[in-house]
Amino acid sequence: MALKKNTHNKSTKRVTKHPSLKTLTHKQIHTTIFVKSTTPYVSALKRINKFLDSVHKQGSSYVAVLGMGKAVEKTLALGCHFQDQKNKKIEVYTKTIEVLDEVITEGQADIDMESDVEDDDKETQLKKRAVSGVELRIYV
C-alpha cells in the first residue's frame, strides 16, 4: 500500500481586529463614555458620576455610555445600577456597528518560517464585520 503525500498548500490567515471609527463632536466627547470588556466596573461607575456632575457645563441633559461586543452586558449592568440605585432615567438603544478586520494571508507555514518576509510585504485584505452594541443615555 502506497502512502499518499499531502500535496495541498497550507495557508494560514492572521486576523487583526481594529476598533470602530469614532466620529464625535466636541460636545459629544465630553458626554460620551466607551466601556470595554476590560473596563473595571467601579471605575466606570466613578467616571459616569464625574461626567454626570459636569454635564450641565457641556450644555447636555444626558451622558451616553457605549459598549459593544462582550462589553454589552457590563454596559447594561451599569445602566441598571443608575436606574435602581440612583433613580436616574435611562434610555437604551441597540445598535449594529460595522468594523473592519485586517486579514493577513500567509503562504505555506514551512516557507514562512525560513523566509524573512516582513508583515508589510504579506498580502492583506480588509473584511467588514458587524458587531452588536448598546447605547445607554443616563439623564440628570
From Swiss-Prot:
InterPro entries according to UniProt: Alba-like_dom_sf, Pop7/Rpp20, RNase_P/MRP_Pop7_fungi
Residues in coiled coil: none
Domain of life (superkingdom): Eukaryota
One GO term describing the cellular component: nucleolar ribonuclease P complex
Keywords in alphabetical order: Hydrolase, Nucleus, Phosphoprotein, rRNA processing, tRNA processing
GO molecular function, one term: ribonuclease P activity
GO annotation (BP), single: maturation of 5.8S rRNA
Subcellular location: Nucleus
EC number(s) recorded for this UniProt protein: 3.1.26.5
Modified positions (Phosphoserine) in chain numbering: S115
Pfam families: Rpp20
Reactions listed under catalytic activity: Endonucleolytic cleavage of RNA, removing 5'-extranucleotides from tRNA precursor
Segments of this protein annotated with the region Disordered: 1-21
PANTHER family, A to Z: RIBONUCLEASES P/MRP PROTEIN SUBUNIT POP7, RIBONUCLEASES P_MRP PROTEIN SUBUNIT POP7
Subunit annotation: Component of nuclear RNase P and RNase MRP complexes. RNase P consists of an RNA moiety and at least 9 protein subunits including POP1, POP3, POP4, POP5, POP6, POP7, POP8, RPP1 and RPR2. RNase MRP complex consists of an RNA moiety and at least 10 protein subunits including POP1, POP3, POP4, POP5, POP6, POP7, POP8, RMP1, RPP1 and SNM1, many of which are shared with the RNase P complex.
Similarity comment: Belongs to the histone-like Alba family.
Free-text function comment from the UniProt entry: Component of ribonuclease P, a protein complex that generates mature tRNA molecules by cleaving their 5'-ends. Also a component of RNase MRP, which cleaves pre-rRNA sequences.
The name this protein goes by in its record: Ribonucleases P/MRP protein subunit POP7
Organism: Saccharomyces cerevisiae (strain ATCC 204508 / S288c) (Baker's yeast)
